[in-house]
Amino acid sequence: AGYGSTSNSCAIVRFSYSTYQGVAMAYEGMHYWADWSNYLGGPDVDESGLVAFHQTGTIMIEAPGGHHEKVVPLLESLNIPHEHWSVEKLQERLPLLTDGVFGPAARPDDDAFWVEPTERIIGALYTPDSGYVSDPQLSTHNLQRAAEAKGSTFVFNRQVVAINQEGGRVSGVELDDGTQIAAPVVVNVAGPHSYLVNDLAGLAGTMNIGTKALRHEVHHVPSPEGFNFETDGMHVSDGDSAVYFRPETGNNILIGSEDPECDVKEWVDPDNYDQEIQQEQWEAQVLRCAKRVEGLGLPHEKKGVVDLYDVSDDWIPIYDRTDLDGFYIAIGTSGNQYKNAGVAGHCMAELIMAVEAGHDHDADPLRVNGRYTGVEMDLGFFSRNREINPDSSFSVNG
């Protein structure tokens, strides 16, 4: 399991969303990773071993008008531990970070990219409970083995070619080898292919929020000489430079993009897209990071991964029922929901049980309490028929 886009996730566990419900779900979701062995049923559930949750903490660079201004009140409202660090404390903890204000983001072929900063950042927002998961593909294998221990069966290397229906509700799926799988409930969790699966179910045009596949690159570069970022680094969200980065094995730094407006978005066919790292994007992301990380070079050899986000119209996921009874969706995850695997599964299970028992979720949106924090999550917030949320970052930040 997990050899789709999940295997190339940056697997960052953070709480810096733009909305109360987004932050609440992410904080609840973190507790699944912190309790991973118990959640799965014990340390021996997977012969390949269990993933590690590296709880390094996250620092978010605070620049004037930055994303932290939206995040801090949400952290406070949910009593999520956080600290404000001065520039001095930030550089004491991570001495290789520079303190200039570089935004708004530009590309290296723009003269504005090379202008020396004249302002200094405010400091950093630190959340000690966040971090990253060591191996996203292994984490899905962990879940596979735990599910199999509870009686689940997995089928691989087959394509769904039809969503079967009978009497106005779903009745199962047909696979490309002719296999018919009968099921009273079907859940679309097809990632970047989710809109195609919805089309198979005859649901095109029935939702107010749509999804489509976005090509994205993540790059790997060596840590600057003299600093071991793998052991001494942490997850850094730098909206001012339009990148985020975290430790990677082999004393490398993994660099992702925070989707600045100057970068052209590549909407693609999920079955046919360029899977090679592009020189222009390689230079843009690595050089942006090099502004913040002193001594970071631009290697000649490009290393990293190319994969897809399943992006909703407002970069907020859709966790909902559909107009086809028995057919549910957990889609539009927009590159920011890996961390929520556990809590999203809990919410979907509660939703499915309630709707199948007769609850009218569209008229009376279900509210679900987190199993760890007890926080109440309003599933109406993730409705397929919501209006586009103006509070969203409209980026991977959610």
What are these regions (language model features)?
Residues 1, 11, 35, 41-57, ...:
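Active-site substrate-recognition segment that forms the wall
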Residues 10-110, 242-244:
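Dinucleotide-binding Rossmann-like beta1-alpha1 core, especially the glycine-rich loop
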Residues 35-39, 146-150, 196, 200, ...:
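Active-site catalytic microenvironments for nucleophilic, acid-base chemistry
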Residues 63-150, 155-156, 162-169:
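Flavin (FAD/FMN) cofactor-binding and adjacent substrate-gating region
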Residues 84, 323-398:
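C-terminal lid/capping helical subdomain adjacent to the catalytic/cofactor pocket in oxidative enzymes
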Residues 96-99, 105-117, 298-343:
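FAD-binding beta-loop-beta segment adjacent to the flavin cofactor pocket
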Residues 125-145, 191-193, 240, 277-288, ...:
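Mid-domain beta-loop-alpha active-site segment that forms a flexible
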